[in-house]
A protein has these predicted regions:
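Feature marks extracellular polysaccharide-active and adherence modules
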Residues: 58, 118-120, 150
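Broad gene-expression machinery/nucleic-acid interaction feature
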Residues: 3-5, 50-52, 83-85, 112-114, ...
């Protein structure tokens, strides 16, 4: 397993320090202030890859994690599964934004993504996930996405999504229909403990918001392309 690691700590005058920024090929990390960008040095993931990123945001620190480009998951000759795991711990009064570019699941690929986040009670979070089934003209491969988020040591969200671009049920009107992208945006904002500050819930044909227990909201959306998907996920 290839492990990359980030540790963010609160610095002087509210700044954020990164005492640990450890890349592990093919996961290469590049920092600018409190923003870290993930560069996939060798492309992929490729079937058989097992990659892990460990993130720790200390009390009062802020970290934004992005990727430079979309991840394109491709099959290997043996048809092996690829696995990417992200584990994050966010301390008291700290903030973490996880805003990677979309993950494209190529035809013939099998991929699993696992995200585990542990938040302090006064921590805040923005977490966006975007999946694309196939490149242009492809139906896409198989993907399983698991998301576990705890707040104050208690479960906040448990989500599992399994899709197969070659499966007729996945492509039926009951699941994706004509959509090729699916995504979610999870926001945890302690200020929403005050109901007057929480945005009103909403829903539409292709997206909806769901208020979770505590000061948290999950938006889920379907779209024909990533531009439309990101627009839907940006609605508060």
């Amino acid at each position: 397993m290839d492990l990359a690691r980030i540790v963010a700590c609160r610095g002087p005058y509210g700044s954020t320090r990164l005492p640990v920024l450890a890349s592990q090929a093919p996961l290469v990390l590049r920092a600018s202030g409190s923003v870290v960008r993930l560069v996939a040095a060798a492309g992929g993931p490729l079937g058989g890859d097992v990659l892990c990123l460990d993130v720790e945001v200390g009390d009062g620190a802020q970290l934004e994690l992005r990727s430079v480009a979309a991840s394109v998951v491709q099959p290997d000759r043996a048809g092996q599964e690829s696995l990417v795991t992200l584990r994050a711990r966010v301390g008291a009064g700290a903030h973490l934004s996880l805003l990677p570019e979309p993950t494209v699941i190529c035809a013939g690929a099998t991929h699993r993504a696992q995200t585990y986040v542990s938040l302090g009670l006064s921590a805040s979070l923005r977490l966006r996930e975007q999946l694309v089934l196939g490149r242009e003209g492809e139906r896409g491969g198989r993907v399983g996405a698991l998301l576990h988020v705890d707040r104050g040591g208690r479960p906040l969200l448990r989500s599992t999504l399994n899709l197969d671009g070659a499966d007729d049920v996945t492509n039926s009107p009951a699941v994706l229909g004509d959509a090729r992208t699916v995504g979610s945006m999870l926001t945890v904002d302690p200020s929403w403990e005050d109901p007057a500050l929480r945005p009103a819930p909403w829903s539409g044909n292709d997206a909806a918001s769901l208020d979770l227990e505590g000061p948290a909201r999950l938006i889920t959306a379907l779209a024909g392309d990533t531009v439309a998907l990101r627009r839907l996920l940006s609605i508060r």
